[in-house]
A protein has these predicted regions:
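Amphipathic, cytosolic membrane-interfacial segments at TM-TM junctions
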Residues: 25-43
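Hydrophobic alpha-helical transmembrane segments of multipass integral membrane proteins
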Residues: 7-10, 14, 42-53, 87-104
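Hydrophobic, aromatic-rich membrane-embedded alpha-helical segments
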Residues: 1-25, 97, 118-128
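Membrane-cytosol interface at the C-terminal ends of transmembrane alpha helices
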Residues: 14-31, 91-112
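Alpha-helical transmembrane segments in eukaryotic/viral proteins
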Residues: 4-7, 22, 57-64, 98-101, ...
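Membrane-helix interface segments in multi-pass membrane proteins
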Residues: 48-94
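Acidic, Ser/Thr-rich low-complexity segments on the non-lumenal side of membrane proteins
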Residues: 131-135
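Cytosolic juxtamembrane helix at the C-terminal end of the final transmembrane segment
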Residues: 101-130
Length: 135
């Protein structure tokens, strides 16, 4: 189940790790890996949301400035920032896929592998010591 928590986040985003975390709550190993995958998805959604906010802000500012200057042509920010938003999303998703595969393999080997930063947070939430022992 720990492997599934990592691998299913590629297609199931935050839903699959959440379901596994809730169902396998009694297993420290599975809940630790599922919580890490869930925290990664939360971070992923925050980064995507931040990219959308910046893109929307850039488009609005360009439209306001072009309207104020009397220029009625299409705002260039839309055509510049839309591909940037797409590249932002794809690069973050690609990194998430690599992380999911690497840590899914480690979970399959029975390792208590931690995501950078998020692993420590998951350990604190579950009150675990390094290696999975309860505090």
């Amino acid at each position: 189940m720990a492997i599934l928590a990592h691998m299913l986040q590629i297609v199931g985003l935050w839903i699959a790790p959440l379901i596994i975390f809730v169902i396998k709550r009694e297993s420290r190993f599975v809940s630790f890996h599922a919580l890490q995958a869930l925290l990664l998805q939360v971070l992923y959604l925050l980064l995507i949301g931040l990219g959308v906010v910046f893109w929307f802000g850039a488009v609005v500012l360009t439209m306001v400035s072009s309207h104020a200057s009397g220029n009625s042509s299409s705002p260039p920010a839309f055509f510049i920032f839309m591909p940037m938003l797409w590249l932002d999303w794809m690069s973050i998703w690609g990194a998430m896929v690599v992380i999911a595969i690497v840590y899914g393999v480690k979970a399959g080997r029975g390792e208590w592998a931690e995501y950078p930063f998020l692993g420590r947070l998951a350990r604190r939430i579950l009150k675990l010591r390094p290696g999975g022992a309860p505090e």
